[in-house]
């Protein structure tokens, strides 16, 4: 059996696809990774990139191009697994046309348009949050896939990052694309002089460091970020929530207020289980 993994866009879709692929490789199951519409830099390993457009009139030419680009890969697969978002459309449409077995993964508590549209063609929709299952007749709750990241002592992680401080370390992460709002919180906390702030600022920020702060656009090894931090302030994308739970870190979630408000529902899921505190941006 050969499994084709279709993902792309942002880290919220790519990270669970990589976790799934890691497990397939551990079990020696043949697989291929297709990524489309990449908006972020991500250590994805070997993969094939294809054209993907958003689900509107202007995106149709890119979708059509992506269908042609992914035809052979889909044709050679037995099963196609899509990880949500518009980038999965070209390979999943190919899978429908080629009568392949289709499975989908929904990363948010409030499902997006892509999975809602494609779910009737899928055998199952695997949901990261229980709340999402009620939107699909074939939905099943599976939790959040997280890569097997190394967990090391705080002192060791700080040494690798060349951080020397006796202050509490506040880790701030705004998702794979970064967050200007959370970057502002990072700068404010630095100004108090009461904390060392380790922030993943994404493409909206710059690499910089000082006596009580270190701002990094991107971490190749995100485990160093979590292992160095005493507490986390984060957006509420699925990947961040999964990693916070994996590293067992106390956290304050400030969900991204746009994109249909799906991060609010993600954050509520963890908050209701006592896994984090939550504040709305306003």
Regions found by a protein language model. Name each.
Residues 1-200, 204-282:
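Nucleotide-activated sugar donor-binding and catalytic core shared by glycosyltransferases
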């Amino acid at each position: 059996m050969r499994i084709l993994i279709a993902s792309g866009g942002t880290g919220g879709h790519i990270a669970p696809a990589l976790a799934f692929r890691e497990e397939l490789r551990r079990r020696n199951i043949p697989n291929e990774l297709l990524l489309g519409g990449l908006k972020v830099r991500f250590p994805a390993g070997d993969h094939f990139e294809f054209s993907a457009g958003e689900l509107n009139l202007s995106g149709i030419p890119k979708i059509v191009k992506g269908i042609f680009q992914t035809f052979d890969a889909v044709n050679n697969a037995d099963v196609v697994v899509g990880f949500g978002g518009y980038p999965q459309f070209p390979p999943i449409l190919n899978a429908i046309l080629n009568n392949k077995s289709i499975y989908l993964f929904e990363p948010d508590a409030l499902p997006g348009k892509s999975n809602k549209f494609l779910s009737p063609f899928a055998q199952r929709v695997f949901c990261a949050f229980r709340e999402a299952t009620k939107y699909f007749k074939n939905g099943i709750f599976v939790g959040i896939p997280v890569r097997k990241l190394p967990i090391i002592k705080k002192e060791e992680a700080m040494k690798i990052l060349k951080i020397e401080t006796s202050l509490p370390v506040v880790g701030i992460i705004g998702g794979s694309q970064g967050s200007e709002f959370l970057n502002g919180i990072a700068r404010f906390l630095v100004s108090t002089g009461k904390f060392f702030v380790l922030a993943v600022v994404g493409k909206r920020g710059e690499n910089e460091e000082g006596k009580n702060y270190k701002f990094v656009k991107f971490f190749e090894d995100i485990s160093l970020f979590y292992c160095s931090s005493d507490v986390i302030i984060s957006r509420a994308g699925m990947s961040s929530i999964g990693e916070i739970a994996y590293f067992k870190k106390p956290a304050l979630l400030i969900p991204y207020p746009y994109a249909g408000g799906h991060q609010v529902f993600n954050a509520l899921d963890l908050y209701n289980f006592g896994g984090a505190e939550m504040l709305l941006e306003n």
